[in-house]
Structures are given as structure tokens and as C-alpha cells.
Amino acid sequence: EIASCLVGSEMCIRDRCFGGINLEDIASPDCFEIEERLDQMLDIPVFHDDQHGTAVVVLAALYNALRVTKKDIKDITVVLNGPGAAGTAIIKMMHTAGVGKIVAVDEFGILYKDRQEGLIPHKRALCDITNPDNMQGTLADALKGADVFVGVSKPNLVTDEMVHSMNNNPIIFAMANPEPEITYQKAKACLLYTSDAA
């Protein structure tokens, strides 16, 4: 997959045939390598909609939710579950936008600097911009006192008890596809909720 993508790109360099490249449906972690290598090879924009398209929409939704809840982006804590292709881009975009604190969680728990298990290169890099307190634990631990949950992971991982442990007026973006991390019915204690189906 990586080789065929790069061969096609080399032809574009030679023929100067495109003004930009949109990558589609390339799984993590291959998508990171492909995007990085294309960025190095080409002098045109490279956009992976699974990463960047999702991140743009989530950030726009966050801005709106913060306006409704009257919270300041620099004062919030965001917990993101599922730092794959979309999750990584969401974290980077939220960091650039000035989110106060971001905590990333994967199937092994909270990402932190000294963790050994499952810390592949793109997740290790995320440790530089997330979890400034070097917190350890589970998704439930991460959600205590958090303002925002962003899920791009698996269905039914978030319980109503976890939502109740969050800060006042929590914002939930449960986007696992086809079923969200928590349903609206279970998260009805939340002020704002969205799912991939919305």
C-alpha cells in the first residue's frame, strides 16, 4: 500500500499533474508514514480526510459547544479515547487551538511518557503534547473532572457513572462507528452530546 501510493506520487512530481493529494481510507499507522513521505516528496498539500477532515469537524463542534456552555478553551480538559489516525489529528489540532489539557487513552490506558506497553511511535510523540501531569490509569480515571470526551474508538466503553464523574456541563463527542462509546440515553446527564450518526 505504501509503495503503490509513493509510486503514483513520483509520477505526479514528474508530470506536475495535481494541485493537492487527498488520502482516503488508509489505516493507522501506515497513514502517518505515507503522509510524512508524501509531504517530503511533494510541494503540494497532502490531506488525509480520515485524519484532518475529522479533526476539523470535531474542532468546529468543540468551538460551538464551548460557546453554549460558556467554557474557555484554555481552561478545559479534553479526554480522547482512540489515538489512531483520526484521534491523533484531533489531538494535534486541539493542541494547536489552545486546549488547556489533553489526555489520550488507548486500549492499554492513559498515554504517559514512561509507559512501555503499546507506545508505538505516533503515540510516543503524542506524549509530548498530552498528559502534562503524567497521569496513569484507565479511561474512567482520565474522565474524572474532565470537561470533554472525544471518542474515536469502540462501542460502549463509557458508562453513565463515568459521565457523572466529569466536570459540570460535560461535552460528549462519542463517534465510534457504527455504535458510539456511549448512547444518548446513557449520557442524558450531559448538556451536549453528539455521535457519528448525528
Task: Set out the residue ranges of the language-model regions.
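Phosphate/diphosphate ligand-binding glycine-rich loop within oxidoreductases
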Residues: D15-G53
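Rossmann-fold NAD(P)-binding glycine/threonine-rich loop
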Residues: A176-S195
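Single conserved hydrophobic/aromatic residue that forms the stacking wall/gate
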Residues: E1-G8, I13, Y193-A198
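Rossmann-like NAD(P)-binding element
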Residues: E117-A176, E181
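Glycine-rich phosphate/diphosphate-binding loop of Rossmann-like nucleotide-binding domains
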Residues: A60-L143
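A glycine-rich, Thr/Ser-enriched phosphate-binding loop motif common to dinucleotide/cofactor-binding enzymes
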Residues: H48-N64
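Short glycine/serine/threonine-rich phosphate/pyrophosphate-binding segments
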Residues: C31, T54-L59, A85-I91, Y112, ...
